[in-house]
Amino acid sequence: EICACLVGSEMCIRDRAVTASQMNRLLNPPTTCNELPKEVCQAQDSLKLMLLLQGMPYADLAHLHKKDIQGDLLTCRRRKTGTELCVKVVPEAMRLINLYRNQDSSSPYLLNFLSGTLKGEAAFNEYGRKLRNLNFQLTRLSELCGVGDIKVSSYTARHTWATLAKYCHVPEEMISEGLGHSSLEVTRTYLKSFDGDELAKVNQVIINYIYSGKKKLWSRA
């Protein structure tokens, strides 16, 4: 996954990541792009939410459970690795969570992206359709925002979060933990886990970089 790119070749990160200014343009279109089609706007919200939640993958975002959020703390296990992920929910992310909060009491899911009523292959197919549509709408978003020369997909937020963190000199071990990776096991045998407050600061550094355009190097001070 991304961790392999951080430790080894950076080429695959660059292929999926965008610059801070490009992400800003995607999340805050120029005046001519303000009236986005509804489905494109929803895809933009998903992109923003994935970014604000420490580069959370769409698979994890769509399958978040209502019980996973307590106050402004989101705690879940990654579907791919089973690694526990704890994210402090910033106000804008909470606004989007509330906007898409699932009102169906019979569904276990926090967000209304999936029905929560399907099982097995039917549930798998539903998720596949949602993911394909998200990627299609993100391509439309990039074209409408004048960045159609870059490939934007459900991976973009995650890879961009990791890349910008690295540009801001955040230690790779913190990036790995922020993303909920199970890799870098050798490093983790002698490194303490980073607490939630430190990861929240990392996330805020990246958010500020994208929204203000000001790059601030990571510091624990």
Where are these regions (language model features)?
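Catalytic-site neighborhood detector that most strongly recognizes the C-terminal catalytic loop/helix
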Residues: 78-82, 179-204
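Single conserved hydrophobic/aromatic residue that forms the stacking wall/gate
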Residues: 1-8, 13
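Short, polar N-cap/turn motifs at the start of nucleic acid-interacting alpha helices
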Residues: 67-75, 151, 170-189, 214-221
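Short, charged phosphate-coordinating catalytic segments
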Residues: 50-71, 173
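Short, basic (Lys/Arg/His-rich) helix/loop patches that form interaction surfaces
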Residues: 28, 32-38, 135-177
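C-terminal secondary-structure termini that scaffold catalytic or DNA-interacting sites
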Residues: 105, 113-121, 204-221
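Active-site/catalytic core of tyrosine-dependent DNA strand-transfer enzymes
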Residues: 17-19, 23-24, 90-149
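Conserved tyrosine-mediated DNA breakage-rejoining catalytic core shared by Y-recombinases
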Residues: 63-99
